[in-house]
Structures are given as structure tokens and as C-alpha cells.
């Protein structure tokens, strides 16, 4: 039924909750898995810097996003190398990608380009203001994906939990 799964990860333990589900589906159907960690595109970083987004260096006339983008790419590759071994140890065929771009759009595009037949990802379970402020990559992927999407809900932890 499924021969190729795409699993988007953002580096969080919450996103990694999808791995056990992807592994189970891959083992059941003999499917291969592509792990994808979308990193920031240079033009996105420049736009965020110009807007004064929190945590982004202040925009200046000579802002060069290359070091930030390269560092994020290196971190993403290192992260995925560690994750890949967990799946390979169970006999699942795994590849990785670290494309640059807007997460939801890039996930949908790569799914289409790779011919993946199922996306397995988590949703952080935000609602109301949290969803409005942070948006929802999972929601956008669900609405635009060219294939079924298996969403694993991860509850947001509150202080004291």
C-alpha cells in the first residue's frame, strides 16, 4: 500500500514522536523512509531580519545570511545522521534531505517530487491564540499534500507538568 514515506522533523523531541509510527508503517509495508529537515532559506532570513523578528540579528546594510544558513544546514545534517541510525538499526531503508525554504511549502513540494505516498508528522496540539500566533505547519501540509497525512498529536507541556 505504501512504498515511500516522508517524515518531516524540526529537531524537537515532539516531532520525533512520529518516528515510531513511521517505522511501524515502513516495516509493515516494506516502505522506504525519507527524513526531511527543512532549513531557513536566505531570503526568509533577510525578510525576518528586516522585520525585526525576535531572535534574528538586526538588519544592516551588509547583512549576509550565508553563515547562518550554512550553520543551520550543518546542524540539520548532523541531527538527521543521528536519527537515521535509529531507523536503519531496525532494517528500514532511510534517506535524508535538508532542503531550504518555508517548512509547509517545502514539505508538500518534496513529497510531490519524491513521489512519497504518505507523510507522517506530528502536530503540537496548539489551539486558539497559540495556533494563530505560531501558525500550523501540520495544518498547511494536511490541506495541500498530494497524499494521505498521518498526524500524530503531541500535547503541549505546561509548566509544572
Predicted regions and their residues:
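A structural motif corresponding to the C-terminal end of an alpha-helix
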Residues: 79-95
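Short, structured motif recognition centered on aromatic/hydrophobic residues
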Residues: 6-7, 25, 33-35, 79, ...
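Short, well-ordered secondary-structure micro-motifs
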Residues: 18, 45-49, 108-109, 131-133, ...
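A short acidic, glycine-rich active-site loop
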Residues: 57-78
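Small/aliphatic-rich secondary-structure junction motif
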Residues: 1-63, 90-95, 114, 154-157
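Glycine-rich, Arg-bearing micro-motifs that act as flexible, cationic patches
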Residues: 112, 118-140, 158-161
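Charged docking surfaces used in two-component/phosphorelay signaling
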Residues: 98-106
Amino acid at each position: 500500500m505504501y512504498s515511500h514515506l516522508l517524515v518531516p522533523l524540526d529537531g524537537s523531541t515532539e516531532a520525533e514522536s512520529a518516528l515510531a509510527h513511521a517505522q511501524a508503517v515502513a516495516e509493515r509495508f516494506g516502505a522506504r523512509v525519507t527524513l526531511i529537515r527543512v532549513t531557513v532559506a536566505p531570503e526568509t532570513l533577510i525578510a525576518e531580519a528586516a522585520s525585526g523578528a525576535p531572535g534574528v540579528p538586526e538588519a544592516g546594510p551588509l547583512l549576509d545570511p550565508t553563515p547562518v544558513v550554512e550553520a543551520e544546514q550543518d546542524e540539520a545534517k548532523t541531527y538527521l545522521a543521528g536519527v537515521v541510525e535509529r531507523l536503519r538499526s531496525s532494517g528500514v531503508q532511510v534517506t535524508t534531505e535538508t532542503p531550504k525554504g518555508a517548512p509547509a511549502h517545502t514539505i508538500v513540494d518534496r513529497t510531490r517530487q519524491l513521489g512519497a505516498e504518505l507523510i507522517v508528522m506530528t502536530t503540537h496540539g496548539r489551539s486558539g491564540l497559540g495556533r494563530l500566533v505560531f501558525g500550523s505547519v501540520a495544518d498547511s501540509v494536511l490541506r495541500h499534500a498530494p497524499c494521505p497525512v498521518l498526524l500524530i498529536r503531541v500535547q503541549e507541556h505546561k509548566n509544572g507538568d
